[in-house]
Amino acid sequence: MAEIYLAGGCFWGLEEYFSRIPGVEKTTVGYANGQVETTNYQLIKETDHAETVQVIYDPDKITLRAILLYYFRVIDPLSVNKQGNDRGRQYRTGVYYLDEADRQVIAQVFAEQEEQLGHKIAVELEPLRH
């Protein structure tokens, strides 16, 4: 199994979306890439975490590239700190990885998205922390 962490607005909708994709084995909501180790819904504005979905997938059934293309279908990659009616830094977009080898795949998909849109995207690309 492999995993990737995706932030894209309210995590409940994103989690439901990815839970229905063949090859995705498990999804879990949580918070990522804040200033401290842990947070909760009441503290999130102070800790600067993003609402995030952990996506565990079988790379024999679906590629990271395919997961990212699904991701870009449901987010607005040009919006800063908001998705739809959800506003605030906790609703920012981001792709957070554990495996350094994934960074190259993610960066390639980001470059393709920027070329298609003709703009730099506002999606964070960072290793997972906190």
Model-assigned labels for residue ranges:
Residues 1-130:
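Flexible coil/turn and secondary-structure edge motifs
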